[in-house]
Structures are given as C-alpha cells and as structure tokens.
Design a protein with these regions (language model features):
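Conserved nucleotide- and phosphate/pyrophosphate-binding catalytic cores
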Residues: 144-240
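NTP-dependent nucleotidyl-transfer catalytic core
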Residues: 1-134, 139-142, 148-154, 167
Length: 240
C-alpha cells in the first residue's frame, strides 16, 4: 500500500533543497489547512477499489512534535557527521554564495531521515520515493535505518519536471500550477496546459495523461494547437 507522508512537522522548518533563501515560515493555521488540501488532492489520484492498495496517510508531526531533543541527538544525531552534511548541494551552494542558512534548515535532512526510520518501524515501509533533489535526504534515511536496525530499505527518485526553458515546475516557483481548485479553478488549470510551450507538448502528453505511448506517437505530427487541446483536455479530466 502506498504511504503518503504529510509534512506537518518538517514544513514548520522548510526544506532548503534547491532554494537560494530561507522558506517563509507558515502559521499553524495555514499548515493545518495545507495538509488537509494536499491530502484531498492525493485522494483523487490514488483512488482505488482494491482495499489492499488503499493509501495510508500519515503526518510526521505525530512523531516529530514529541521528540526529546537530548534523546534525539544521542540516538539519531550521532549517525550524522558535519563533514557529510556540509557536502550536500543544498548546503554547499548556500555557503559558496554566502547566503544565509539557518540552523533550523540545516537540521531538515536529519528529520527527513528520521521519518523514513519511523515509517519503517511502524508501517514496515521499505521504499521512499521522491524527486531527484531529495536523493541525498533519502540516502540518509536508508543509511540511518541500516545502522539502527540492520533492515534493508530502498530509495527511488524521479527527475524534476522542467520546462524547455530550464525552469523547474514546483509549488514555490513563479507561475506554478495548483491542483487545488480553490487555488486554481478548473478552467485556469485547463488554460495552463493549453498554453504549454510547443517544445514541451509531446513530453507532457507522455507525463501528464494516461494516453498510450503508441497513440501519442501516432499524433505527434498533428497540428501543435490540436495537440495542446488534447493535452489540456486529458490533464484536466484526470484531476477535475
């Protein structure tokens, strides 16, 4: 069964990966609201009639909010060296550019590793999946679990979604596309895909629709505007 980890605890800190400045600290009310909305979106894409595949939703604030600092340093912190933590791109780039990196953010990688350990112990989670920018954090979790329990676990990452311009698509990036209809109405969501750069249309048809690859190959020489409409229709149907 898929386990959806909601970052009610770690979002209070903010992941520095790929960021040039400290993330804005959200209020408690905003965090609770965001968690609820994110869970509702995941339910749309993970809907199933098979009870064995029904997703499990967990909020890491459940365990991170109860941590004893001294005990955590003794049992978990001792497995992390400053040397290795400084080698991570998210840290190294900030320091090289003489940009601020708070102690709070510096600890994020340890907390994410601890999440994996907790899920392995309580849910028998054997694999963590995330974007490629999370590879280092995932490896930290794999190594922590091996040191703590000897269990063999795995990590799987997917490439970050980028536009032909090289810009990353993400919720904190300018022009992000939101899945929550309260933040982006269905028509605006459709319009986002309709306005896709010509160079990205075929790639996005393969990534964001359930069209068979052979069908996409058969139509890829069609008028580009017709393809954009197909992309917009298919992507919107899957969400709304």
């Amino acid at each position: 069964r898929p386990i959806v980890l909601l970052g009610g605890g770690t979002t209070r800190i903010g992941d520095p990966s790929g960021k040039e400045e400290t993330r804005k600290i959200l209020s408690e009310a905003q965090i609770v609201k965001n968690i609820k909305n994110i869970q509702n979106v995941f339910k749309i894409f993970l809907k199933t009639n098979n009870p064995k595949l029904k997703p499990i939703f967990v909020n890491n604030y459940k365990w991170l909010g109860k941590l004893n600092y001294i005990k955590f340093l003794r049992e978990i912190g001792r497995h992390f060296t400053i040397n290795k933590m400084l080698s991570f791109d998210s840290v190294k780039l900030r320091l090289e550019r003489e940009q601020s990196l708070s102690y709070m953010e510096f600890n994020y990688m340890i907390l994410q590793a601890y999440d994996f350990l907790e899920l392995n112990k309580t849910k028998n989670c054997l694999m963590q999946i995330g974007g490629s920018d999370q590879w280092g954090n995932i490896v930290n979790g794999v190594e922590l679990i091996k040191r703590q329990s000897g269990n063999q676990v795995y990590g799987l990452t997917t490439p970050l979604i980028t536009l032909s311009s090289g810009a990353k698509m993400g919720k904190t990036e300018k022009g992000a596309v939101w899945l929550d209809k309260k933040m982006l109405p269905p028509y605006d969501y459709w319009q986002f895909w309709r306005n896709t750069d010509d160079r990205d249309v075929i790639k996005f048809l393969k990534m964001f629709t359930d069209m068979p690859l052979n069908e996409i190959e058969n139509i890829q020489e069609n008028n580009i505007n017709d393809l954009k409409i197909i992309l917009a229709n298919k992507a919107t149907e899957m969400l709304h």
